[in-house]
Amino acid sequence: MTLLLLPLLLASLLASCSCNKANKHKPWIEAEYQGIVMENDNTVLLNPPLFALDKDAPLRYAGEICGFRLHGSGVPFEAVILDKATGEGRIRAKEPMDCEAQKEHTFTIQAYDCGEGPDGANTKKSHKATVHVRVNDVNEFAPVFVERLYRAAVTEGKLYDRILRVEAIDGDCSPQYSQICYYEILTPNTPFLIDNDGNIENTEKLQYSGERLYKFTVTAYDCGKKRAADDAEVEIQVKPTCKPSWQGWNKRIEYAPGAGSLALFPGIRLETCDEPLWNIQATIELQTSHVAKGCDRDNYSERALRKLCGAATGEVDLLPMPGPNANWTAGLSVHYSQDSSQIYWFNGTQAVQVPLGGPSGLGSGPQDSLSDHFTLSFWMKHGVTPNKGKKEEETIVCNTVQNEDGFSHYSLTVHGCRIAFLYWPLLESARPVKFLWKLEQVCDDEWHHYALNLEFPTVTLYTDGISFDPALIHDNGLIHPPRREPALMIGACWTEGKNKEKEKGDNSTDTTQGDPLSIQRYFHGYLAGFSVRSGRLESREVIECLYACREGLDYRDFESLGKGMKVHVNPSQSLLTLEGDDVETFNHALQHVAYMNTLRFATPGVRPLRLTTAVKCFSEESCVSIPEVEGYVVVLQPDAPQILLSGTAHFARPAVDFEGTEGVPLFPDLQITCSISHQVEAKKDESWQGTVTDTRMSDEIVHNLDGCEISLVGDDLDPERESLLLDTTSLQQRGLELTNTSAYLTIAGVESITVYEEILRQARYRLRHGAALYARKFRLSCSEMNGRYSSNEFIVEVNVLHSMNRVAHPSHVLSSQQFLHRGHQPPPEMAGHSLASSHRNSMIPSAATLIIVVCVGFLVLMVVLGLVRIHSLHRRVSGAGGPPGASSDPKDPDLFWDDSALTIIVNPMESYQNRQACVTGAVGGQQEDEDSSDSEVADSPSSDERRIIETPPHRY
């Protein structure tokens, strides 16, 4: 038995030894795997497939693969064994994959066998293989545009390769689905095209005159043909062709007088179309040549302006108005300017010789000579004459004068744009000196004022009130002196020569003494206001006050003037030049160029304006050109001053007051006021629901008058019976002129309102003793600024009261007869009738005297009867208790008429009317059986008489 068990035991031991030695090999897998997993799926497809091999196969456990292990941080996969015998395995995702989150995953994998038994003892592992898993994309996202709205601008008339680019993106991760394959314009009939990259171009030239804004819709597709969820909008604006020019300016600029300085281009800017510039020069020109004489000046007359500016008197007018005392200008062509001043036209063949002595005020003796101190003053409009030779001078004035030492000579000539003054202090010994100026004003064919002050050896020329020193002083050396003979010629000059034909015009004057003179160097242009003053010079301040322009271009913002900017204004302020190198700085400077007019009552009208620009570019080939800008300044009508004359408009005085030596003042309480009315917009109240209207307010101003006139309403004055009186001494002291005729009385000259009030209050009306005048009307009116503004017509009505005790006087009886003959006219119109001739005053009919006495007695009787009737009526009321219906209470004081202070006022005109009716009956042979209606008319004053006597004073 023991022997049988021993072999069995040995067999089991051998079997156990052989089992331990069975798991000899490790599993084997590929070194690298490539895997693909679809997005939103968890199965990984590997290449090559996942198989693990073990050389211990087919042994159980040792030859079987029990599983796979994955190594890596956060590996979202797991590996499962499908068949232990074959070693087949699978990798799967723990959850659906998201390509957009992570496209690829890399980790390692290792296989292990089942060991040597079911307990997995002595398990062997394979090497680690690398696994690359790529997540395949699914087209789940639609394209999305970067912007919902695309805008662009194009210039008209051009074809663009690319106007703008639209862009869409896709949220998918793969190139197939994340890329946009093409775009599409959805709006039909648009002149645009879009390519696969989103670039938009125009298919035809766009015009600004056509459609100025194009709107259309575009969409996008990815390579999976998925369309964008939201389409994009595109707006393309068509702009006009870019032209370098000034932008932001107004053609019409309104200027209100009194506004001070007004910016001409407050919003202007220069459009250069992106062309770089390194120099800009602009010139602003204000044209005022059509306003009076060249520009807006004070509106007073020349005489009034000289007084206001403090100019000395004593000037002599060399070109006066043609008349009996000044006939040397009769042959010249005369024009009139806007200020009513005379202008003389010299056509190049005419000249005038001013006679010395007499009305001209220029004598030929030493006491009347011009010496070496004088002022020449004149207006001139001169342009370059094409047909005249380049070397030919034109003479304005030529004069030879005699002084204590001999003869001196001077001439003023123009030559092109040069003006020259030749002065020869002494023809016998001194050498002539020529002073030259080169001024553009001389040849611009515009009006300018020239004043030449000679204080030898100093000569100063003022043009429009601005002084200019000579550009050249030339000593002419020895030249042939002119004839030693006093002569003054305007418009040409004489040259001494024999056997020369004269070139004289219609009004040229010959010199009869000595050899014949040749008139040459005729002037071609306009002259006006030509005067000379000897012995005293006009000061600079006076000349500037008289002739300086009151309007022009202005620039005052020098503090903010940018770096590199230059500003230049010509003396007459009609031309302003700006220069700079930076566009923005230049724009700022130009925005501060202003127009200014210092006159309170500026001349209304249009002032043309021109802006010219020259630029320099870095590239001369593509340099731009800036077109000219033209506009105009409109000076509005100023608020007219209202001159109001007021005072007592009606008064009556006894005839003895008018017959006094001083007469009766016509305007004893005259008041003159000057005010300006202007629009004031009413302020809006928040609670007010109606419309807001404009109101006018008046501001009283201090101003001057330049003339007043007292005229007659009705017939002219009869110098034999009546006159207007005014103190001429006070007028002369103030430099005022008086003109007194039978039709009017005028006071001329600029003075303050206070002075005119004082003078007019002294105006008196005087009657000669015995003049039978009963009423007069006088009209007073005043004006200012050379008659530009006039006052109201203030009418004063005057009644002359004649006393009744004058009736018996023969002259008054006769006056009553004359008054009766025109009794059908109202008293104001009777004032101009003259007295009867003296032979009719020599006797008075006795019958007329008798009738007058009877009429007066009848009038007294009627008055007495009236008093008796009133007294009897009073007694009846007191005794009988009054009429029916009246109160019977005797204590009521209102029922009794107290006649203790009864006064009867007799109208003197009524008594005159009664007497005149009686005289008419005697002298005219009227019948005694006249109608009772006629008697009633004769006994009562007419309506006009009532108005004269009873109406309160009017205010006009």
UniProtKB/Swiss-Prot annotation:
One of the GO BP terms on file: excitatory synapse assembly
Entry-linked SMART domains: CA
Post-translational modification: Proteolytically processed under normal cellular conditions. A primary zeta-cleavage generates a large extracellular (soluble) N-terminal domain (sAlc) and a short C-terminal transmembrane fragment (CTF1). A secondary cleavage catalyzed by gamma-secretase within the transmembrane domain releases the beta-Alc-beta chain in the extracellular milieu and produces an intracellular fragment (AlcICD). This processing is strongly suppressed in the tripartite complex formed with APBA2 and APP, which seems to prevent the association with gamma-secretase.
Chain spans, region Disordered: 917-956
Top-level taxon: Eukaryota
Keywords, sorted A to Z: Calcium, Cell adhesion, Cell membrane, Cell projection, Endoplasmic reticulum, Glycoprotein, Golgi apparatus, Membrane, Postsynaptic cell membrane, Repeat, Signal, Synapse, Transmembrane, Transmembrane helix
Ranges for domain Cadherin: 29-145, 146-246
Membrane-traversing stretches: 848-868
Location of this chain's protein in the cell: Postsynaptic cell membrane; Endoplasmic reticulum membrane; Golgi apparatus membrane; Cell projection, Dendrite
Biased composition (Basic and acidic residues): 943-956
An example Gene Ontology CC term for this record: cell surface
Acidic residues bias spans: 927-937
Chain ranges on the Cytoplasmic side, renumbered to this chain: 869-956
Spans within the Extracellular topological domain: 20-847
Glycosylation sites per record: 299, 327, 347, 507, 740
GO MF, one example: calcium ion binding
Domain notes: The cytoplasmic domain binds synaptic Ca(2+).
Family: Belongs to the calsyntenin family.
Complex formation: Interacts (via cadherin domains) with both alpha and beta isoforms of neurexins (NRXN1, NRXN2 and NRXN3). Directly interacts with APBA2. Forms a tripartite complex with APBA2 and APP. Interacts with low affinity with KLC1. Interacts with SLC23A2/SVCT2.
Described function: Postsynaptic adhesion molecule that binds to presynaptic neurexins to mediate both excitatory and inhibitory synapse formation. Promotes synapse development by acting as a cell adhesion molecule at the postsynaptic membrane, which associates with both neurexin-alpha and neurexin-beta proteins at the presynaptic membrane. Regulates the balance between excitatory and inhibitory synapses by inhibiting formation of excitatory parallel-fiber synapses and promoting formation of inhibitory synapses in the same neuron.
Name of the protein described by the UniProt record: Calsyntenin-3
UniProt source species: Pongo abelii
Gene designation: CLSTN3
